[in-house]
């Protein structure tokens, strides 16, 4: 069995690499996908549609272009991991989790205990809540167990 796993959320740490390395170390047959993680490139995704003097419209265009990628990859995924960091509010990650719930797409949340209360509804719809990337890898190992 193989899986396509979309890695959603926080872009300021190497959590995606940790999961990918862990999966590789266990020879798991997983294709990982993700949003564009270069913050400047993501913010500029809509610039090809024309220059905007108002930052709202620049952000609006970029959000729509980014959504093409995000929605497509979430829909193609067998499973989604949604990471919430402690430094920034990841509204986009919460939106991705809600989209997964609406699609009945299984997802795992990954965040510290300090975020349990603010994310209680997001966690309630998730199939699992992990606090470490190692726990995520163990879940992936179990799911792919023969």
What name fits each language-model region?
Residues 1-146:
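Conserved catalytic or regulatory cores that recognize and/or transform ribose-phosphate-containing ligands
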């Amino acid at each position: 069995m193989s899986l396509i796993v979309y890695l959603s959320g926080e872009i300021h740490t190497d959590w995606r690499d940790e999961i990918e390395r862990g999966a590789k170390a266990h020879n798991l047959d997983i294709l990982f996908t993700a949003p564009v993680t270069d913050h400047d490139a993501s913010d500029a995704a809509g610039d090809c549609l024309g220059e905007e003097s108002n930052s709202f419209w620049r952000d609006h265009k970029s959000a729509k272009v980014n959504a093409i990628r995000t929605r497509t990859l979430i829909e193609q995924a067998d499973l989604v991991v949604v990471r919430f960091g402690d430094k920034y509010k990841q509204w986009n990650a919460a939106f991705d989790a809600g989209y997964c719930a609406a699609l009945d797409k299984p997802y795992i949340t990954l965040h510290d205990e300090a975020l349990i209360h603010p994310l209680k509804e997001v966690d309630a719809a998730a199939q699992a809540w992990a606090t470490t990337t190692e726990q995520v890898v163990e879940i992936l190992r179990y799911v792919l167990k023969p």
